[in-house]
Regions:
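Surface-exposed polar/charged interaction patches
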Residues: 7-11, 67, 128
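A structural boundary/capping signal
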Residues: 40, 57, 65, 145-146
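Extended, charge-rich helix/loop segments that form flexible
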Residues: 50-111
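Short alpha-helix boundary/capping and kink motifs at helix termini
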Residues: 89-160
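Phosphate/pyrophosphate-binding active-site loops
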Residues: 130, 169-183
Length: 183
């Protein structure tokens, strides 16, 4: 319900300010996988989805290769290492120790279940050569809210917004040409 309220407010403001081609809140866009090379160093909240930034907006970015979650996923899915040897278990357990939870996980059993679910999603993506949009996964999803978060810089290049890291890792390791993303 909150997403719907945010969308109505955002979409109406954008329509009035920028016209009918303005981006919508949590709008789904199709991104070419090969075009994603950088990520933000600090996340921007998903609630800022669809905002048009000033022309001189210059976020601090770094190489996607610096992303720990994507790195351990590549080690697991592409290089064949176990989740344990890829560093995924240690990464999650340290985050749980510091923050109490990560990715809805609070225990080692939760982490194991999550990684098992990710393996199933990866297998489906490999078999079908696509990632499902959020609405295909859950009928209660609003647009692409919760998907791979992507921002577009002033030159039209996509920047990974640090949301949907495992899904992006799936797109990269399966070799998908493109994937759905939340703008």
């Amino acid at each position: 319900m909150l997403q719907l309220i945010r969308a109505c407010i955002h979409d109406k403001k954008s329509l009035l300010q920028f016209g009918p081609t303005a981006p919508k809140y949590a709008e789904v866009i199709n991104v070419q996988t090969a075009d994603i090379e950088t990520q933000l160093t600090m996340p921007i909240r998903r609630s800022a989805s669809g905002l048009i930034m000033p022309e001189d907006w210059c976020p601090v970015v770094e190489s996607l290769s610096n992303n720990q979650k994507i790195s351990y996923c590549i080690k697991h899915w592409r290089d064949g290492l176990s989740w344990e040897k890829s560093g995924a278990i240690d990464f999650h357990m340290k985050a749980i120790q510091v923050n109490g939870r990560i990715d809805h996980c609070r225990t080692r059993a939760d982490v194991d279940q999550r990684l098992s679910r990710l393996d199933k999603i990866w297998q489906l993506a490999e078999r079908t050569q696509k990632l499902k949009q959020k609405r295909e996964v859950s009928p209660f999803s609003f647009r692409e809210y919760g998907g791979i978060l992507v921002h577009i810089d002033g030159q039209g290049n996509p920047i990974f917004g640090l949301g949907g890291q495992h899904r992006l890792a799936i797109a990269l390791t399966v070799g998908l040409r493109s994937f759905p993303a939340q703008l």
